[in-house]
Swiss-Prot record:
A GO biological-process term: tRNA wobble guanine modification
Highest classification ranks of the organism: Bacteria, Pseudomonadati, Chlorobiota, Chlorobiia, Chlorobiales
Record text on subunit structure and interactions: Monomer.
Protein name, UniProt field: S-adenosylmethionine:tRNA ribosyltransferase-isomerase
InterPro entries in the cross-refs: QueA, QueA_dom1, QueA_dom2, QueA_sf
Keyword Cytoplasm in record: yes
Gene: queA
Length: 341
């Protein structure tokens, strides 16, 4: 398949630039992946589409302070966003502005060196001193809202670009399918008999970068660390034998479960099942684990859009997106959601 098959026109007014006034007050488009039928609902009514015995899997990662502003000797401001958290001396960053190899930057009296330009808008940065780049971001960094929002982070983002069940720090982007999940909705689902459990996948900004290769087979996928509790593996095995459904809340959960799918079959013990998900899911992929997917409306040419198309079917997803655009749904991280079953 070609990357252009996943392009569509997304105008600025369709992008949700801010979270809704109240968490969970967004819309929900429900798509039947077998028939292509579409139902318009609200996110708060998700319980109507779940059944007793279903297993809801959530990502409990917490977003780091991963956005930092630096300046060049000319005074030009450069925005830096961590692509992943490592304990290395050098880290890859997504940048906005003009940089070249050898440039020196200043960030809060700390000198930085651009050691390499890796790709379009991606550089490798080193700190000229004893402090690590991760430490610098942790001390001075801000909320890493996505670049496509085209604004600086504000106070509202500190709370709303984090899920209500965020626990383990490590992500440089939020698992956005869960941003509208509320404690009240989770309680409603529990009362209905829906089981729920968390895994951890630390999200890198590479998740949201567009695919630049013309042929999907030429795209090199980024890696993201994940940890799946042994209890979740057992719950999945049980659900698969009792007729329940494994419901992935987000593409991050999907990537972790599908990457670990083959190992789950023979996994034993109490230790978590860990790995680095570098799986690239696009149409033609045969899903092993998940039965339903709760996700947002994604950017054109993105790997998360391709994953969603693989699960829903390209034609069904294309039709659903067209209806969502016509009906005024809000797109991307702070926008409305889809439930695909």
């Amino acid at each position: 398949m070609r990357t252009g098959d996943f392009d569509y026109e997304l105008s600025e007014e369709k992008i949700a630039k801010y979270p809704p006034a109240e968490r969970g007050s967004t819309r929900l488009l429900v798509l039947n992946r077998h028939s292509g039928a579409v139902v318009h609902a609200s996110y708060a009514s998700l319980d109507l589409f779940l059944q007793p015995g279903d297993l809801l899997v959530l990502n409990n990662t917490r977003v780091l302070r991963a956005r930092l502003y630096a300046s060049k000797s000319t005074g030009a401001r450069i925005e830096l966003m961590l692509l992943e958290k490592h304990q290395e001396e050098q880290n890859r960053v997504l940048y906005r502005g003009k940089l070249k190899k050898g440039d020196k930057l200043m960030a809060h009296d700390q000198e930085l060196l651009v050691t390499d330009i890796v790709d379009h808008g991606i550089a490798r940065i080193a700190v000229c001193g004893e402090r690590s780049l991760s430490d610098l971001f942790e001390r001075f960094g801000g909320v890493p809202i996505p670049p496509y929002l085209k604004r600086d982070a504000e106070e509202v983002d500190r709370e709303r670009y984090q899920t209500v069940f965020a626990e383990l720090p490590g992500s440089v982007a939020a698992p956005t399918a869960s941003l509208n999940m509320t404690s009240e909705l989770l309680d409603t689902l529990r009362r209905k008999g829906v089981d729920m459990v968390t895994l951890t996948l630390h999200v890198g900004l590479g998740t949201f970068l567009p695919v630049r290769a013309d042929a999907l087979e030429e795209h090199v996928m980024h890696r993201e660390y994940y940890s799946i509790p042994a209890t979740l593996v057992e719950k999945i095995r049980k659900v698969k034998t009792t007729g329940g459904r494994v419901i992935a809340v987000g593409t991050t959960v999907t990537r972790a479960l599908e990457h670990a799918g083959e190992r789950m079959e023979t996994f034993t013990g109490d230790a978590p099942l860990t790995g680095e998900a570098d799986i690239f899911i696009y149409p033609g992929y045969q899903f092993r684990i998940i039965d339903c997917l709760l996700t947002n409306f994604h950017a054109p040419r993105s790997t998360v859009l391709m994953l969603t198309a693989a699960f829903a079917g390209p034609d069904h997803l294309r039709n659903a997106y067209q209806k969502a655009l016509e009906e005024g749904y809000r797109f991307l991280s702070y926008g409305d959601s889809m439930f695909i079953a």
